[in-house]
Amino acid sequence: MEQQRKSLKRILALGACMLWPLQAGAASPDTDALAAKHASANYKEFVELLALPNDAMVPADIQKNTDRLEQAFQKRGFQTRQLPNNGKPMLYAELPGRDPAKKTVLFYAHLDGQSVNPKQWQQQSPWEATLKQKNAKGEWEAIPLEKLYGDQVDPDWRLFARSSSDDKGPIMMLLTAIDALNEQGRKPSVNVKVILDSEEEKGSPTLGAVIDQNAELLKSDALLVLDGPMHQTNKPTLVFGNRGVALATITVFGAKQGLHSGHFGNYSANPAQRLSQLLASMKDETGRVTIPGYYDAVKIDAAAEKIMAAVPDDETALRKRLGIAQAEKVGKNYQEALQYPSLNVRGMAAGDVGPKARTIIPETAVAELDLRTVPETPPAHLIGLLKKHIEAQGYHLVQGTPTDEERAKYDKLAAVASDDVSASSSAARTDMQSPVGAWLYRAFKDTYGEEPVRIRMMGGTVPTGAAVEALKVPFVIVPLVNADNNQHSNDENLRLGNYVAGVKGLIGVLQQPF
């Protein structure tokens, strides 16, 4: 009886797409059933796609994936074109019959994946999709893949494979949503274009150039980015921006060579101690950056504060997971903290430690920084403020290694080297009240029967900047995969309930008037 009860529960879970609690009667049974039906029908195609290695560093891998996905889009009636890109072509697809009375939406996803170390995976191969469920101990254990093609699929089962969630899963969700509409004879409410990036995992260094070269082809009214994890609650999620990143290396100089600490201690200044004092001057004990002007350009209005406060973050659980007693005091909450530029010391070096440590005063001390930017504080602005602050602490900035003349003239010497930041690493944000934001909000609310979680700006950096700068259109990130998907790591996975619900959400988006 218990086994029958579990089987019935699984069947109902698939048919009703029980990814998250929905308000009673809010979700369309037709959309639920349609999404479940076509998701099930396409699992085999998904597994076959996952079997293709797609290392962003291997052109042959990229070509095979581009070819396979081109066939997949053509099968759904898309017109396609491979966009040349140094041996790693991007894929463009468009549904024919463009209606000038409709808005045109460009869907972005990426077909490349992170490199893998097969020995770190708990299965035979990262490219051999493995179906798993949790056992009584809460551990993932493999079950026959054939169960995926049956009629008793548990939405909590997961498919483990490289790129299952990042980003082949969302690509298959879009294709499956198109299948569902095609079967019903329905046309999307918007003109649909798609671009599949082939180097996202390398930071999309050529995305802007490819878009510029195909500007007319990719012309659109809005950009939807199908990438990234949903909110931790697994509720429908819309993300309206991302921080950028700038990198800087600070070198503080001491004597021309390492000195014996007995002979020269108390006489020659230690650059490691000076660097420590310099870094300490950049932030206070609450974690706020004290460099003058660092936050000044950031303004958050009451409407944005209200939306951020409504994000269902469990900060007590978050701090417990991170293993910290309290958060830094940059914003009122986690979401607000991400709206400001940050300053992070990502590495330091001076002398040696452990068995290799010597009794010397090191000649240099180096700190590597990453500065997370926001649209109001571009990289050049923050790097400029950083340099001014260092000079205000009494340092003379040099280019490269200081000359003998500079050493004789200045007591405190330092160098700041900053990387040229491409548009792919730029911060970008769309107004949450913009037409595209309102359109997606309505689509998700109508489809799922609850308000989506709206993230004003996520803390990480994704390559939207290049696309937004080249296309000159508003964008929204539409994450569809489970937050605990092990993205970029070993044992990457996709929850089947998320797959079905993602199909459902995209059906809703494609049917919502814009």
Regions found by a protein language model. Name each.
Residues 2-12:
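Bacterial N-terminal signal peptides that target proteins for export
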Residues 21-24:
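N-terminal signal peptide c-region/cleavage motif recognized by signal peptidases
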Residues 27-126, 364:
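N-terminal helical capping/dimerization or prosegment-like subdomains
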Residues 100, 232, 290-364, 375-388, ...:
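An extended, acidic, His-containing surface patch that forms the Zn2+-binding/catalytic region
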Residues 102-193:
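Active-site metal-coordination/substrate-binding segment of hydrolases
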Residues 152-241:
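Acidic/histidine-rich catalytic neighborhood of metal-dependent amide-processing enzymes
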Residues 237-253, 478-481:
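Flexible glycine/proline-rich, aromatic-decorated loop/lid segments
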Residues 265-286:
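A short core secondary-structure module
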